[in-house]
Amino acid sequence: VVESLGTDKVIFLPDHYLANYVQKNTKVKIISWQGTCMVHEKFTGKEVEDIKKENPGIEVIAHPECPPDVISASDFAGSTSSMVKYVKENQPKKVLLVTECTMSDNVQVENPNVQFIKPCNLCPHMKKITLNKIYDCLKNETNEIKIGHNIAEMARKSVLRMAEIG
């Protein structure tokens, strides 16, 4: 995605660790925003190494928003969809997904033969979303965010282009 922009420098946000991960995989100069994901930032490389010692043969799959020591201690790092694909295609006997723990629950449903080790870091912001709240928003048409047509069109183009690139 970064290289498809046709520039030699990109301002990358919102996550500093993801920017560092992307920088290692491109020649484009990345200028990163110093934000992080509070869930991924809680994990440590030592924690991953300890889990590997306690669970011989476990495959550790990390999200690139994790700190570099976590990525280094992992067997695979990739986007959320890449993590899901990795589990589905490789069917490891035992796996640790280094990301928000609800994701492990969802992936486990689709991969019942895989044992998931879950050091649970929950995202308090994701937990604010409930089925009842979604139902109320749809039923009452509340909490709508309105943006201008021009901004919506630019955002739509960006999202479609990103999906096209992969």
Cite the ranges covered by each PLM segment:
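The feature marks the mature, well-folded catalytic cores of soluble enzymes
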Residues: 1-166
